[in-house]
Amino acid sequence: MQDKNEQMAIKIAGQVAQSGGRTFYVGGLVRDHLLGIENKDIDIEIHGVPADKLKEILSGLGEVTVMGASFGIFGLRHYEVDIAMPRMESATGRGHKDFEIVTDPFLGPEKAALRRDFTMNALMEDVLTGEILDFFGGRKDLAEGVIRHVNAETFVEDPLRVLRAAQFAARFGFRIADETIALSKTMDLSALSMERITGELEKALMKAERPSVFFEELRRMEQLHTWFPEMKDLIAVPQPPSHHPEGDVWNHTMLVLNEAAGLRSAAKEPRYFMYAALVHDFGKPVTTEVIDGKIHSYEHEKEGLPVVSKFISRLTSETALAKYVLNMTELHMKPNILAAQNSGRKSFMKIFDRSVCPEDLLLLAKADYLGRNLTCRDYPEENVLREMLAVYNDLMSRPYVQGRDLVAAGIAPGPLFKEALDYGHRLRLAGVPKEQALPQVLALIRRSAGS
């Protein structure tokens, strides 16, 4: 069943046809249609109708919005349809905005498709007839799972295409053509904005079953150094084979990332969680050493925090994400260690209380444990960790001593307040009911005030 946006696209195409033009679905919509993937982002391109006539047609169908006048892109209010005129682009500088755009309604479909990045994205589908135009072998590449650039000359003008190739490879499980890999090696990514980088990175992290492919392909393209140098530093950092049969820290991180992708739907903060999985072992390159013939990475979870902070700040100014990721990095080893050591309840409560998100911390611990190429997929620590988390959540759901309780007892806010509330919180973690905890807190205040 067609939604209102598809219906509007067909209406536009009908009006355009009456004026002697043609309307095509373009870009990812055609690709996803052929792959059997739902895509509600409707992009259409209008050929054979001048801009003034197109605006007249659109005005008869609704309120026209100009989304990019210089790009020849329009919309209709209340509809999610991008309506574009054919255009040619040429780079005028290194920045992503440094392009000269020339719109030409009579450019022709083949020349218009020439500006597309990959053959699979250069396919065009006639909105009215369903005819698919394929000028560069896109259907064959799509069927064979190949990501191949359309035109070498135009491809190198937008360095973001290096990352787009990598994220498409991760999302669709495709391989990048050797000639596209070779071309990507020559491109300079330094002028890209952090927003464009994170846009492609997060598509891989959030949409791919195997986000590791994104980084594996960037490694093949020799493009880790500009935006992801910390990832490059993981390569060839050894790990003890007895605990890590998968090999170096790079291999481990790739496996953990894929395990995390299988768990992200269960995470409270799935996007943050995927970043945490990515960076959790960034401390190993700076701590790994061989002592008496054995490989150790002592304190890597703490020593990695400045490395993680630098990495995150390069990609985003989102403080909540940084706080979450740093906290998860510091604590990522604790749950499995406590479970393996049969630690007491108090130790678990302390760790959960230090965590920004205990539920996600356990998911990260699971991904870390399973990301080791183990033949056995059992995770024996999971039951006790879940039991301890249930205890913690139960304690946090109970009534507890708050500031207003102290005020009601006649205690004026002052220096002892925080100390008293901290003590009350420790009693809460120990399972002491509020009615028993409050007298103990008040007694502490009296003792402290009298000393």
Model-predicted regions and their roles:
Residues M1-S451:
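Catalytic cores of the polymerase beta-like nucleotidyltransferase superfamily
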